[in-house]
Amino acid sequence: MSLVRTVTIVLFIIAFLQNAAAQKRQQSIVKSRGAVATDDGRCSVIGMRVLREGGNAIDASVAAALCLGVVSPASSGIGGGAFTVVKIAGGKEIAYDSRETAPLRATENMYGGNVDLKKKGALSVGVPGEVAGLFTAWKQHGKLPWKRLVTPAEKLAEGFKISKYLYMQMNATRSDILADKGLSDLFVSNGELKKPGTICHNPKLALTLKLIGEYGPKAFYNGTVGVNLARDIKKSGGIITLKDLQSYRVKIKEPLSADILGYRVLGMPPPSSGGAAMMLVLNILSQYGIPSGVSGPLGVHRLIEALKHAFAVRMNLGDPDFTDVTKVVSDMLSPKFAKDLKSKINDQKTFDPKYYGGMWNQIDDHGTSHLSIIDRERNAVSMTSTINGYFGALMLSPSTGIVLNNEMDDFSIPMKSNGNLDVPPPAPANFIRPGKRPLSSMSPTIVLKDGKVKAAVGASGGANIIAGTTEVYLNHFFLKMDPLSSVLAPRIYHQLIPNRASYENWTTVFNDHFEIPKATRVVLEKKGHVLSPIAGGTIAQFIVQESGENSGGRSELVAVSDPRKGGFPSGY
C-alpha cells in the first residue's frame, strides 16, 4: 500500500471518528425550521419547544434566557441585565439595552478607592434590567403568551440538576457561598457543596417567576418581588431602593452596523464596547487579504495587534446618555481609521501598551451567558446576559431566590496614583453616576448577507468576549472553516493591559482539551509577545444559515454550542 493511500485512509478514519464524536455529543446540528444554541442544552430544548409551538425567535429567547438564569445561576439571571440584537425577517434591526444601572444614591467616590466593595456584597449591585428587557422585546415582537414563556423556568426552579460546569463555578467560589446564607441554603448540604447531578431546589425563585409570569415586569419592579428584593438589599447594606426599580427603563436603539467583505455585521452600541471593538478588529484584518493575510502564526500576531489597538480605543466609550461617544464610535466603525491603525502594526514585533495610544486603564468584566436563535421565518436573536462575576455579588436574596449581580464592578473609579507609570489612570467616561450604565464587553452579533440573516453569534467570558466572538467570526467568514470547527478552534486573548496574550491550554470538566499549538507560540514569543496559559476563556454560541444545497434548495441552519461549557443546541 502506498504511503499516500495510507495517509489518506488514516485521515479519513480520524475525520470519521471526530465527526462521530461530535454527533454523539450533539455539539452541532443541522435543522431547516429553527435552531437555538445556548450554554446549557436544557435551555436550548426549552427554546426549541417554543419554536415548535409557533413561537418566534423572540419568544424562544425569553424562555431560554429565563432557563439559563435558573440552571446557570453563576453566570446570568433575573438579578442581572442583558444586551440583545434582533433582526426581524424583512424588517427592522433593533438593539435592546437592558444593562444594569447605578442606583440613584450612587456616587463617583462611593467606594473610597476600596475595590473590594465594588466587587462583591450589597454595594456592588446594580439595578437589574433583564426582566424588563425580555418583556419589552416580547411585547413588540412576541407571539406566544408571556406566561407560557416563563413557566418552564419556574418549573426548573422547583428542582434542577447541578451541571458539571456549575459545580466548577461553585468550587471556585466555595468560601463565598458558605459565607452567604442565601447561597449556602441553595448549594450546600451538610457543610459541603452539592455535587454534580444533585437536585437543587429554589422554591423562592420559583414563586418569583410565577409572579412574573402572572403579572409581568410590574411584579419585579413595582410589586411584591421588588419590595422584597429592595428590603433584602437594604438589610445587607446596599443602597438600591424600590424607587430605583420603579425608575428602570429599557433603552431601544439601532444596532451598530458595518459592511465587511460582503457581509453586514450588526452589533450592540454603547454602553457595550463589544460591537464597535469587534468591527474595528475586523476592519483592520480585512485589509490583509483573505484568507492568507490572517492565516497561521502571522495571522494570530496580526489579530493580537488589532485587539490591542481596539482595547486602547474602547476605554473612551461609556454610557452615551452621560458621555458623548459619537466621534469615538464613528472612528471605530471607519475603514479609514482601521487603515491608519493597520499601518502601525509591525509584522516583526509587538510593543508596550503606550505605543497603541490608550490613555486609560482597562476594566475587567466577567462571566455572562450567551444565546443565539434563528427561527422558521428567519428572525434572529443574539443575546448576552450577565450578573458579571461568578454568582455576581456573591449574595442571594433570601425572600426572592434571586442571585444578585455585581455590575457596579464594571465602572471605573477614581484611584490615587501608585507611582507606576506603566498603569494608566481609570477612564472618566466610565465613572459612576446615578442612573448610569457601566461599560461592557458583551458582543451579541448578527450577520446579514444581501439583507437576510446569515448568522447569529456571540460568547460569554467577560472582557475576553470581544476576542472570542471575533475569532469565531474570523474562523468562519475569513478562514472558511465550517461552523463547528470555527467554535472548536483554540483561542487567544489580549486586553492591552496587562501586556500579555492569554492562550487556551486547558482540559474542560467534560475532558475536551484546547491549546494554541506550540509552533504558533514560539513564533509569537520571537515577536516579543508575553504568553500566559489560561484554563478557561470564552463560550460561543453560533448559528449559520447555509444555502441548503443538500435539502432541495431550502436553507438549513447549522447550530453549534461550545463544548467548553457542555451545552448543546436544539432545533427542528
From Swiss-Prot:
Q: Extract the signal peptide range.
A: 1-22
Q: Does the keyword Hydrolase apply?
A: yes
Protein name in UniProt = Glutathione hydrolase 1
Pfam families reported in the protein's UniProt record: G_glu_transpept (PF01019)
Which example biological process does GO assign this protein? response to oxidative stress
Q: Which UniProt keywords apply?
A: Acyltransferase, Apoplast, Glycoprotein, Hydrolase, Secreted, Signal, Transferase
UniProt GO MF annotations: glutathione gamma-glutamylcysteinyltransferase activity; glutathione hydrolase activity; leukotriene C4 gamma-glutamyl transferase activity
Q: In which pathway does it act?
A: Sulfur metabolism; glutathione metabolism
Residues listed as glycosylation sites in the UniProt record: N171, N222, N505
Reactions catalysed, semicolon-separated, are: an N-terminal (5-L-glutamyl)-[peptide] + an alpha-amino acid = 5-L-glutamyl amino acid + an N-terminal L-alpha-aminoacyl-[peptide]; glutathione + H2O = L-cysteinylglycine + L-glutamate; an S-substituted glutathione + H2O = an S-substituted L-cysteinylglycine + L-glutamate
Which organism's genome codes for this protein?
Arabidopsis thaliana
Upregulation = By glutathione.
Q: What happens when the gene is disrupted?
A: Slight reduction in size, early flowering and increased chlorosis in older leaves. Accumulation of GSSG in the apoplastic space.
Q: What does this protein do?
A: May play a role in preventing oxidative stress by metabolizing extracellular oxidized glutathione (GSSG).
GO CC annotation terms, alphabetical: apoplast; plasmodesma
Q: Where does L-glutamate bind?
A: R99, T386, N388, E407, D410, S440, S441, G461, G462
- Write out the tissue specificity statement of the associated record: Expressed in embryo, roots and leaves. In mature plants, expression is restricted to vascular tissues of roots, leaves, flowers and siliques.
